[in-house]
UniProtKB/Swiss-Prot annotation:
Region described as Disordered: 376-396
Natural source organism: Haemophilus influenzae (strain PittEE)
Family annotation (InterPro entries): DNA_mismatch_repair_CS, DNA_mismatch_repair_MutL, DNA_mismatch_S5_2-like, HATPase_C_sf, MutL/Mlh/PMS, MutL/Mlh/Pms-like, MutL_C, MutL_C_dimsub
GO molecular function, one term: ATP-dependent DNA damage sensor activity
Lineage: Bacteria, Pseudomonadati, Pseudomonadota, Gammaproteobacteria, Pasteurellales
CDD domains found in the cross-reference section: HATPase_MutL-MLH-PMS-like (cd16926), MutL_Trans_MutL (cd03482)
Pfam families (alphabetical): DNA_mis_repair (PF01119), HATPase_c_3 (PF13589), MutL_C (PF08676)
Keyword terms: DNA damage, DNA repair
Amino acid composition bias (Polar residues), ranges on this chain: 382-396
Disulfide bonds: none
Gene name tied to this protein: mutL
Transmembrane residue ranges: none
Name listed for the protein in its UniProt record: DNA mismatch repair protein MutL
Length: 629
């Protein structure tokens, strides 16, 4: 068969295979076009699940008569004009494929009128060459698109449609997702002439919560925590549910990037990590999150249906989302929005004004060739780049910090090091000690692991008991070692080193203090500096900016830790001991992890501080048990 150019209709039908999956795909594309046209009132009429008729009516700006034919042409759009526009997309549509693809697999009619026109015009395309026909019509300002007999000319596609009920359920879900991000737009959804959904415009927070309650349920709103988290051009807002409102399936997870509904692995991982300590692995968090960022920093042109995006700074986005959600979950009593509006206003009075984003949005285009959606971006001069700053939303609210989000699974290097660490004894020694251990400790504790491992020249680790302690043997003596106390000792030893490795924070943490807290800071500033913290002090505004932390504490909740140290009783305990008492200890599910901690601690021991370690060893007396045998 010779090479030849496909007919316009066939080319559009091929494109429709990606764009038009089912009636819900048509509704999504057409409603997004209405929103891009500035509509604040959209009506969606469906018949027989969308197979017979889909009608979208809006009150947007409309399409001029001379552009109606182009509207049905492939790769014709008013939303971008050049490559710069493509790299800074804020509109929902931009490829110019939807109308052409839909019209090739259905009987599509487009009727529109602009405010400048005295009459409306209607256009439709038909035939192998998709020739358009324009005729006058009666219509108010705005646009109506009717899609009749979807897949009438591709019977193979039509027979794969589900029942009317199933297809309409998918359409309903599309409208729900769009209504969650376009609060100022009214949506009406009908099926076979009956109104099924009607979302009124929501202009204030109470009205927005009502819409969220209608879509996500009253229980979600009752358990919702409000997020308003900012850093430079990044802004995270919305609601996350408390852990007790976890879901057995992932059916209440809505995330939007610059108003676009997306699915992204980086965002999903950050959210799961933030909930990791609260939810079991088989539970799912519920959330409605809006992420606004510079459009130059995200690429939305990576998926046929634009459901996926790619971030230029994935690590920054991940850490920003993780810290924002973690702060909300750790401070539920502060962020819970079951308060009066006056309380919210009081919080806003205590905020620090966030610097404006370093990009500006141009007004709607005046003529074709101008992009009304792509912002003009101005690079910051590198030599004058200031330190990061952040806006607290509540009193003592702090920005995000560095987050090490490595996978929970050990890397190949870690596995190799573990293998070297877990060197087993010779078989004869294993047998002797194993028999002794089984004879002495059977039925006395829940033994998670019974491997016999040599962890130092003096102590041998026999077992990890209830994830809380190590059972150790030295000659004929046995000891229990608390892992929590061992971890706190390891922190103290690491922070007492002469040279402490520092970790710069990806996003510095900003503290707004009271006068009493600032006085406490001045008293403890040398102590913080000695152990590796680096602050920038602003005495006039009673503000501290944390830029560097000790590497050993990089995964800790530094906001909570620092504030606790500035409000503690100065006579309670030494500074370093009090600081380590504020740190959160990890849980140990494997003997290898516990042995790694023991090895790290022994490496830091010296002749002067070895006593502190030996005091943690609690002798085990087997004699009463032996007497009962």
């Amino acid at each position: 068969m010779p090479i030849r150019i496909l007919s316009p209709q066939l080319a559009n039908q091929i494109a429709a295979g990606e764009v038009v999956e089912r009636p819900a795909s048509v509704v999504k594309e057409l409603v997004e076009n209405s929103l891009d046209a500035g509509a604040n009132k959209i009506q969606i009429d469906i018949e027989n699940g969308g197979a017979n008729l889909i009608r979208i009516r809006d009150n947007g700006c409309g399409i001029p008569k001379e552009e109606l034919s182009l509207a049905l042409a492939r790769h014709a759009t008013s939303k971008i004009a050049d490559l710069d526009d493509l790299e800074a997309i804020l509109s929902l549509g931009f490829r110019g494929e939807a109308l052409a693809s839909i019209s090739s697999v259905s009987r599509l009619t487009l009727t529109s009128r602009t405010e400048e026109q005295t009459e409306a015009w209607q256009v439709y395309a038909q035939g192998r060459d998709m020739e358009t026909t324009i005729k006058p019509a009666s219509h108010p300002v705005g646009t109506t698109v009717e899609v009749a007999n979807l897949f009438f000319n591709t019977p193979a596609r039509r027979k794969f449609l589900r029942t009317d009920k199933t297809e309409f359920a998918h359409i309903d879900e599309v409208i729900r997702r769009i209504a969650l991000t376009k609060f100022n737009t009214a949506f009406t959804l009908t099926h076979n002439g009956k109104i099924v959904r009607q979302y009124r415009p929501a202009f204030d927070l109470n009205q927005q919560l009502k819409r969220v309650a209608v879509i996500c349920g009253d229980d979600f709103v009752k358990n919702a925590l409000r997020i308003d988290w900012k850093h430079d051009d990044l802004h995270l807002s919305g609601w996350v549910a408390t852990p007790n409102f976890s879901r057995t399936q992932n059916d209440l997870s809505y995330c939007y990037i610059n108003g676009r509904m997306v699915r992204d692995k980086v965002i999903s991982h950050a959210i799961r990590q933030a909930y990791a300590q609260y939810l079991p692995t088989d539970a799912y968090p519920a959330f409605v999150l809006f992420i606004d960022l510079n459009p130059h920093d995200v690429d939305v042109n990576v998926h046929p249906t634009k459901h996926e995006v790619r971030f230029h700074q994935q690590r920054l986005i991940h850490d920003f989302i993780y810290e924002g959600i973690s702060y909300a979950l750790n401070n539920q009593e502060q962020l819970n929005w079951h308060t009066e509006q006056s309380a919210v206003e009081n919080h806003e009075e205590n905020t620090v004004r966030e610097p404006q984003p370093n990009y500006s949005i141009r007004p709607n285009r005046a003529a074709a060739g101008q992009n009304s959606f792509a912002p003009q971006y101005h690079e910051k001069p590198q030599q004058n780049q200031p330190h990061f700053s952040n806006t607290p939303v509540l009193p003592n609210h702090v920005s995000t910090g560095y987050r090490d989000y490595r996978s929970d699974a050990p890397s190949k290097t870690e596995q190799r090091l573990y293998a070297e660490l877990l060197r087993t004894l010779p078989p004869t020694a294993q047998k002797d000690i194993s028999n002794t251990a089984q004879q002495n400790i059977s039925d006395t504790a829940k033994i998670i692991s019974t491997e016999i491992i040599e962890c130092s020249s003096h102590l041998r680790a026999l077992s990890l008991i209830e994830n809380r302690a190590l059972l150790l043997q030295q000659n004929q003596d046995f000891f229990l070692l608390s892992l929590e106390k061992l971890q706190r000792l390891q922190w103290q030893l690491a922070l007492q080193q002469i040279q402490i490795e520092q970790q710069p924070l990806l996003i510095p943490i900003v503290f707004r203090l009271t006068e009493a807290q600032f006085q406490a800071w001045q008293q403890y500033s040398d102590n913080f500096k000695k152990i590796g913290f680096e602050f920038i002090e602003n005495q006039a505004q009673l503000r501290l900016t944390l830029n560097k932390v000790p590497n050993v504490l990089r995964t800790q909740n530094l906001q909570k830790c620092v504030m606790a140290m500035l409000t503690r009783d100065e006579n309670s305990s030494p500074f370093l001991t009090a600081l380590c008492a504020q740190l959160e200890c990890k849980t140990f599910d494997a003997l290898a992890d516990a042995l790694n901690l023991l090895s790290e601690t022994e490496r830091l021991l010296t002749q002067t501080n070895r006593t502190a370690f030996t005091q943690l060893l609690k002798p085990v007396n087997w004699q009463p048990l032996l007497d009962e045998i």
